[in-house]
């Protein structure tokens, strides 16, 4: 009831609504000062926001994920949902310089004349695209930052680190690309070694710990299945069938051998079960995990890349997470999946890797591969809240909420194999609206797992992101968690299993858009350790600066441009300054802008703060740059990218994830 009253007070009481009904925006519309409202042109539609951002990756979107083109009254297509079949792959160079010659040493290519890449540097330079012309980056930003440009002759800012007379690259540091890997120069960590990746691809990786825990889990499951069968049925199964020595029973040799093997296997399972039945077999000593009052950025697929996380660290974040990685591609050594755990040195400690899986064997092997291949990880997080249809139908993400026993097996398997890395889990209130299950689930997680932290998103899967998060329920679950924890510690297993000083960290998530939200939810219940921010940190990346200062910061357009400059800088250091790297930087810059443009400046608002689900009328900023940054037009986002990456190539393609480009009824 208090939450409803608070909502009414923000919008205004009934009397004020009646008085202003002819002049003020309707409910769900951000209140803009009249002088900044731009009148609609003839035949121009009002902006209508589509706020069902699923943070879903292109690699996981297909026909299962929804998205429709409905017809409106005029019979025209109504742009809704996601662009499922968008193709943002960028055009690569026609003449590709041999990777061994990037830094000019022709002797390093072992293929010689048989190499399929260009070996003539002068020929390559003559066909290379013109250099980037940028007022913000007049010279190579990577060279200026690192004293060395990893892209060498391929750099689009080549003139800033090339001796044109001798055609020799300039370097401020003595760096041997073979002796010192490029990623270490860039300050990046968690790169899997080529040898380890090849072992995964060739299925040579020794999943020793995974095999151990899976054998234990299988024995418990078999014992559970047997306990639910009638005793006669158990005795009649081939592996446990009692033979009467007085009666000859002719059996085919193959069947006899198979029955013998099944019997031996079942007896071994029985021995394993008896050995571990009264123990917390999954318990392992872990590093301490401290999320208490930490400023946490949620895992964000596509937009939560390394440059963005690095930007958030600079702007005050304490904890960041990788984009969601799928367990099976990790186990198979897929390059694109192993790119996700990469992090910048500024992110550790406080960097977590999020994994999605549907079965215990996937969870165990993915966690063991991570624990043995990368070192700068503070936690491994099991994603049990992702609402994407494709993952849900495969049994991953929020589908685990419908099968708590499977989720528990996944968590215990991960805990057993992850060495000293803590295991955490992110969940939702449930899968169906009006049927929350998180309260009962956390009780089981306390008693049956050793998770170090639980993050609860205050929405169900069915709600997605369109309705307000239920923080009353989040607070209720936090109380239930502490009560269950206190009861468990009093039990015999609890006294041995959990240290009462290291309680399970509980983090709330959903609809945090400003420092007032952050402190209201954090201070509203002492059982909540911290608050996680997702979309609020994309729309307003300086949100943690506001949390620190406990005041709203009305960033000017110049200050916001500096934030974009940092993002562009970090992007080029990560993806590179060659043609393909610049194209990637521009693409992810536009992905970032699809949220960043939704910020409504405080100085033009009649009422502040603006809620996440409130959309503004057509507005103009206090200067031209502010207006450009608030544009919903993809072409304006590309125009902003030109400030950092030079004029857009005619072959550059960017299709926004949402057909509305965040707003519907656009003709372009």
From Swiss-Prot:
GO terms for biological process: mRNA processing; tRNA modification. The gene is DUS3. Catalyzes the synthesis of dihydrouridine, a modified base found in the D-loop of most tRNAs. Specifically modifies U47 in cytoplasmic tRNAs. Catalyzes the synthesis of dihydrouridine in some mRNAs, thereby affecting their translation. It catalyses: 5,6-dihydrouridine(47) in tRNA + NAD(+) = uridine(47) in tRNA + NADH + H(+); 5,6-dihydrouridine(47) in tRNA + NADP(+) = uridine(47) in tRNA + NADPH + H(+); a 5,6-dihydrouridine in mRNA + NAD(+) = a uridine in mRNA + NADH + H(+); a 5,6-dihydrouridine in mRNA + NADP(+) = a uridine in mRNA + NADPH + H(+). Its EC number is 1.3.1.89, 1.3.1.-. InterPro entries: Aldolase_TIM (IPR013785), DUS-like_FMN-bd (IPR035587), tRNA_hU_synthase_CS (IPR018517), Znf_CCCH (IPR000571). Its cofactor is FMN. SUPFAM superfamilies: FMN-linked oxidoreductases (SSF51395). This is tRNA-dihydrouridine(47) synthase [NAD(P)(+)]. FMN binds at residues 299-301, 354, 426, 457, 509-511, 534-535. Its main location: cytoplasm. It is found in: Cytoplasm; Nucleus. One of its GO terms (cellular component) is nucleus. The active site is at residue 386. Residues 70-83 have a biased composition (Basic residues). It comes from the Eukaryota. A zinc finger (C3H1-type) spans 92-122, 134-164. Residues 1-22 have a biased composition (Basic and acidic residues).
């Amino acid at each position: 009831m208090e939450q409803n009253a608070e909502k009414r007070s923000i919008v205004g009481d009934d009397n004020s609504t009646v008085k202003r009904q002819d002049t003020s925006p309707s409910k769900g519309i951000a209140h803009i000062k009249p002088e900044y409202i731009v009148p609609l042109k003839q035949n121009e539609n009002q902006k209508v926001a589509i706020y069902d951002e699923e943070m879903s990756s292109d690699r996981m979107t297909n026909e299962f994920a929804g998205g429709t083109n409905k017809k409106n009254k005029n019979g025209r297509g109504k742009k809704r949902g996601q662009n499922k079949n968008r193709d943002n792959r960028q055009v690569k160079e026609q003449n590709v310089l041999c990777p061994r010659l990037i830094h000019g040493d022709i002797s390093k290519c072992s293929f010689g004349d048989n190499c399929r890449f260009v070996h003539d540097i002068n020929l390559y330079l003559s066909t290379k695209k013109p250099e980037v012309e940028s007022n913000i980056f007049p010279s190579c930003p990577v060279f200026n930052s690192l004293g060395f440009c990893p892209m060498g002759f391929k750099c689009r800012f080549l003139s800033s680190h090339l001796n044109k007379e001798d055609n020799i690259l300039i370097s401020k540091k003595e760096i041997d690309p073979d002796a010192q890997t490029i990623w270490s120069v860039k300050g990046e960590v968690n790169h899997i070694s080529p040898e380890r990746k090849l072992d995964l691809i060739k299925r040579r990786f020794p999943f020793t710990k995974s095999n151990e825990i899976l054998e234990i889990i299988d024995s418990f499951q078999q014992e559970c299945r047997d306990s639910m069968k009638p005793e006669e049925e158990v005795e009649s199964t081939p592996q446990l069938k009692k033979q009467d020595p007085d009666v000859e029973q002719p059996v085919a040799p193959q069947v006899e051998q198979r029955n013998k093997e099944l019997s031996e296997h079942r007896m071994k399972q029985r021995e394993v079960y008896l050995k571990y039945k009264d123990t917390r077999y999954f318990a392992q000593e872990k590093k301490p995990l401290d999320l208490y009052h930490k400023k946490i950025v949620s895992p964000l697929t596509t937009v939560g890349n390394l440059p963005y996380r690095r930007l958030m660290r600079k702007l005050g974040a304490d904890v960041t997470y990788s984009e969601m990685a799928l367990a099976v591609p990790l186990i198979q050594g897929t390059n694109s999946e192993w790119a996700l755990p990469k992090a910048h040195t500024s992110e550790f400690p406080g960097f977590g890797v999020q994994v999605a899986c549907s079965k215990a064997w996937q969870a165990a092997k993915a966690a063991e591969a991570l624990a043995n291949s990368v070192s700068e990880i503070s936690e491994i997080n099991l994603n049990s809240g992702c609402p994407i249809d494709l993952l849900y139908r495969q049994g991953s993400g929020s589908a685990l909420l419908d099968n708590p026993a499977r989720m528990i097996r996944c968590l215990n398997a991960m805990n057993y194999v992850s060495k000293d890395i803590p295991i955490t889990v992110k969940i939702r209130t449930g899968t169906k609206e009006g049927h929350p299950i998180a309260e009962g689930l956390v009780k089981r997680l306390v008693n049956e797992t050793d998770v170090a932290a639980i993050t609860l998103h205050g929405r169900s899967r069915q709600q997605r992101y369109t309705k307000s998060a239920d923080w009353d329920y989040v607070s209720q679950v936090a109380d239930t968690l502490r009560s269950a924890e206190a009861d468990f510690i009093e039990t015999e297993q609890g006294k041995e299993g959990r240290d009462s000083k290291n309680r399970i960290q509980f983090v709330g998530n959903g609809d945090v858009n400003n420092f007032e939200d952050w402190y209201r939810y954090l201070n509203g219940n002492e059982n909540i350790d911290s608050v996680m921010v997702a979309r609020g940190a994309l729309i307003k990346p300086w949100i943690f600066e506001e949390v620190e200062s406990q005041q709203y910061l009305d960033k000017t357009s110049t200050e916001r441009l500096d934030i974009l400059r940092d993002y562009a800088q970090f992007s080029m250091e990560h993806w590179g300054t060659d043609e393909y790297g610049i194209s990637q930087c521009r693409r992810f810059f536009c992905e970032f802008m699809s949220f960043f443009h939704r910020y409504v400046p405080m100085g033009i608002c009649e009422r502040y703060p603006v809620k996440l689900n409130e959309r503004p009328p057509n507005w103009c900023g206090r200067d031209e740059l502010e207006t450009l940054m608030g544009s919903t037009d993809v072409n304006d986002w590309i125009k902003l990218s030109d400030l950092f990456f030079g004029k857009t190539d005619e072959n550059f393609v960017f299709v926004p994830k949402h057909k509305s480009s965040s707003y519907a009824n656009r003709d372009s």
